[in-house]
């Protein structure tokens, strides 16, 4: 039903810029465009699969830590997801903003606006996380009245607030890079950070050293830290714009002055 509704809206064309006639769906395929789409879609899909599988594995670590820890971990993730909603929205916006600016050749504007979105997300999410952390126990009481579960939730929400300043560099920046067709770099970084940090560090701290669910979350924060460093470096150096080279300024030759 949703797909039919979308096709109907596009065919009617409430926005003339988005009007797509039904005849256009039966035209010959343009494989050059398809390859460009696949160049972004395939790395993004691989990144999503790797992230989901790694997150599932870390949840298996928590599954053997008792019902109170499992419940507290689930509730903390739910609260953290609510806190991160503005950042997720800005991440989606960064893809659109950079893609739109680069599509019309405004390379400098794309770079400036991605930085603005990044800092807006960083400051906003940090403020939200730090303001809501003191009320972690109150928010947990909407889910349960078990004191052990609430204790786990409070610890995890405070840890989440402590590491929130690096969240935007981990997730908003790669979303903006995808708007510049720089999806492969995000894929390789995600593979390295997920399996080299979140899974390994989470297992070592949470299982081998006995830190429990805190160790598993520290593995997640190590994943954030690696992603934040690599993606921030990518933004600062401007290498995420490698498919959009800047035009070289033309050198003006000085004409010799002829004296009369």
Question: Where are the regions a protein language model picked out?
Answer:
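Hydrophobic alpha-helical transmembrane segments of integral membrane proteins
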Residues: 34-36, 69, 82-86, 92, ...
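Generic hydrophobic alpha-helical membrane-segment signal
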Residues: 35, 42, 54, 156, ...
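Helix-terminus/linker motif at the lipid-water interface of multi-pass membrane proteins
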Residues: 49-82, 100, 138-147, 208
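Hydrophobic alpha-helical transmembrane bundles that constitute the permease/transmembrane domains
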Residues: 1-7, 14, 41, 45-60, ...
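C-terminal structured "cap/appendage" subdomains that terminate the fold
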Residues: 173-177, 184-196, 203-218
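Short alpha-helical transmembrane segments in multi-pass integral membrane proteins
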Residues: 1-42, 98-163, 205-260
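Small-residue-rich hydrophobic transmembrane alpha-helices
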Residues: 72-136, 167-190
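Short amphipathic alpha-helical segments, especially helix-boundary/capping motifs
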Residues: 33-37, 55-59, 70-75, 112-116, ...
């Amino acid at each position: 039903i949703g797909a039919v509704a979308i096709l109907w809206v596009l065919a009617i064309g409430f926005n003339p810029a988005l009007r797509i006639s039904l005849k256009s769906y039966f035209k010959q395929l343009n494989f050059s465009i398809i390859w460009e789409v696949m160049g972004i879609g395939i790395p993004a899909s691989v990144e999503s699969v790797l992230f989901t599988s790694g997150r599932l594995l870390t949840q298996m670590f928590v599954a053997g830590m008792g019902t109170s820890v499992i419940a507290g971990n689930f509730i903390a993730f739910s609260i953290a997801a609510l806190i991160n909603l503005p950042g997720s929205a800005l991440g989606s916006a960064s893809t659109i903003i950079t893609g739109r600016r680069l599509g019309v050749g405004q390379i400098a504007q794309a770079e400036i606006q991605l930085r603005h979105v990044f800092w807006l997300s960083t400051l906003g999410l940090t403020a939200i996380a730090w303001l809501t952390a003191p009320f972690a126990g109150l928010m947990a009481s909407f889910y349960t009245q078990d004191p052990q579960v609430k204790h786990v939730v409070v610890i995890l929400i405070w840890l989440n607030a402590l590491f929130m300043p690096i969240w935007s560099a981990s997730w908003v920046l790669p979303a903006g890079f995808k708007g510049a067709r720089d999806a492969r770099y995000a894929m390789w970084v995600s593979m390295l950070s997920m399996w080299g940090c979140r899974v390994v560090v989470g297992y070592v701290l949470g299982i081998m050293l006995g830190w429990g669910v805190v160790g598993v979350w520290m593995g997640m924060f190590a994943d954030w830290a690696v992603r934040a460093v690599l993606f921030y470096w990518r933004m600062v150096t401007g290498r995420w714009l490698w498919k959009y080279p800047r035009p070289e300024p033309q050198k003006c030759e000085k004409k010799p002055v002829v004296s009369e």
